[in-house]
Amino acid sequence: MSRMRKNMNPPKKGLKGQPSPVPKLIIKGGIEVLGLRTGPDSTTTIELFLNPRMGQSTESEYYGFSDNQRGSTSRTDEDLISAELPRYSLGVVQLPLLNEKLTDDVLLMWEAVSCKTEVVGVNTLTTCHGYKKRYSPSAGQGSAMPIEGINYHFFAVGGEPLEIQFICEDFKAPYHPTETIVPPKDKLSNKSQVLDPTLKGILDKDGVYPVECWCPDPSKNENTRYFGTYTGGVSTPPVLQFTNTVTTILLDENGVGPLCKADKLYITAADICGFLTQPNDQQQFRGLPRYMSVTLRKRLVKNPYPIASILTSLFTNSLPPVTSQEMDKQVEEVRIYQGVEGLPGDPDMVRYINKFGQEETCIPK
């Protein structure tokens, strides 16, 4: 029979446990805080938001919506306007410069460790009044149709711009090259409707890359983490969660997060929440903004650039940019002299260095 031994020593009065250690907040403020230099072991958290780019301009009364969707009656005669197309939103944050000497063997770089994000304005999807199509045919009776339909939610955090792949439903669609960025018409073919590895790009501008024909490139983006979901359907109810307790880890399988090149952080987002249906059955895409909170730390890395390349870049960039005729196809002959030799018997002799570094002499025919 076992016995339970009781601790007969009562706890001493006045002794308490120590508080749990948490990160020490030393600076808090707006964008001006980014200019301050902090210690080597400090972390930085940046809060920002990206507004949607659904097609309507920032001055329009329908900002946050696309223009009316116009289904085409013919594949060869489609009337597509660029305001119908939701696009990706892009934000770039300039981080504090960490290195005063770029010639050192070891450098400090900002590394994105984790982020918190959510779609802001989910509450607006509960609006069931106003100038929208109603379920009841009687005027002024019954609720209006809420936002419903296609849901596309995407965000990316990286140390450089998001690398993207062009793929579309119909390569004959008349995209406007001046208002949106798409490959030239002469490069589009039926291969554009599947994966054409020649149609790649970099998302370097806000509000000009249409969502329907650009997607993140899975074969690249080693320095970017992206996340996305899609729910199709014309009348699909939006399903969105919002909380400030979920943290997304940005580290890869080696424990390394996106390294911010040139001390810049790139945020990309697109959030399509469905269609707004008007009384005349016209439909517009509805987009919502996205909030981001990104935590960064300082990471020691090996300097990937030798001093020679840095100096070469410095001298090259000091020259003014010029636009000239294309010389690659107009240069007829190049001669390089080095040292001396005996007088050759053929003044038109052609010699060159092959790709293996060996000297070759062409025998005349």
From Swiss-Prot:
Chain span(s) of sequence motif Bipartite nuclear localization signal: 5-16
GO molecular function: structural molecule activity
Keyword Chloroplast found: no
Entries under SUPFAM superfamilies matching the protein: Group I dsDNA viruses
Any one GO BP annotation for this protein: virion attachment to host cell
Cited Gene3D superfamilies: Capsid protein VP1,Polyomavirus
Subunit structure and binding partners: Homomultimer; disulfide-linked. The virus capsid is composed of 72 icosahedral units, each one composed of five disulfide-linked copies of VP1. Interacts with minor capsid proteins VP2 and VP3.
Name of protein: Major capsid protein VP1
Organism: Bovine polyomavirus (BPyV)
